[in-house]
């Protein structure tokens, strides 16, 4: 199964806590401002791009324990985010609008990832090709807001209400099939799907995140 998640829309509290989701790091004097406790000044300095690329530090997603499930009913546990965030680097690319079928058409790469334990979130360092991602680069230089969304493959998900494990939505239990994100009074909880084994393969700039 493929899951899509947009932090600004799906986890509004994450945006409130962070203040800013995306930061362009173009010069040496931007490094301190763009760093965090997870994506440190040293990490940014070690990953400065060549002249043909630009670098962005962004927040990809937050842990479910702190920020809840998203509007699709997907819950991303802290333990899974800690364990699998590096798949953004090993399997992922920087795309536009989730056109992620062909890595050759990617706008760039994910250079580094980190789990910020203090802030309960995954942070990424991406390099964009200044020609392929010219639009994104120009907007970032102008200080315009850029929205990002991620995609992940999961071998299954688990209903938090009854524990049913499904490899496809056709095998969902009654809670996820008809009551996703709804309160289930007999269990005194909201129904959502736990994704505890994600492979993150796509971080995309999206124009209309709410679509």
Model-predicted segments: where are they?
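Signature of dsDNA virion morphogenesis modules
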Residues: 1-211
């Amino acid at each position: 199964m493929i899951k899509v998640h947009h932090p600004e829309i799906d986890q509004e509290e994450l945006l409130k806590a962070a203040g800013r989701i995306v930061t362009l790091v173009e010069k040496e004097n931007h490094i301190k401002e763009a760093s965090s406790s997870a994506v440190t000044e040293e990490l940014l300095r070690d990953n400065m791009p060549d002249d043909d690329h630009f670098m962005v530090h962004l927040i990809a997603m937050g842990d479910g324990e702190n920020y809840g499930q998203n509007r699709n009913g997907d819950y991303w546990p802290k333990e899974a985010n800690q364990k699998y965030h590096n798949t953004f680097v090993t399997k992922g690319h920087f795309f536009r609008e989730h056109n992620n079928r062909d890595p050759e058409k990617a706008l760039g790469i994910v250079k580094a990832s980190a789990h910020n334990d203090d802030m309960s979130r995954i942070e990424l360092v991406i390099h964009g090709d200044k020609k392929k991602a010219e639009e994104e680069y120009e907007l970032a230089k102008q200080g315009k807001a850029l929205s990002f969304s991620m995609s992940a493959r999961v071998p299954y998900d688990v209903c938090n209400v009854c524990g049913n494990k499904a490899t496809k939505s056709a095998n969902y239990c009654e809670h996820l099939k008809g009551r996703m994100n709804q309160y289930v009074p007999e269990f005194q909880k909201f129904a959502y799907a736990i994704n505890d084994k994600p492979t993150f393969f796509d971080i995309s700039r999206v124009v209309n995140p709410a679509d």
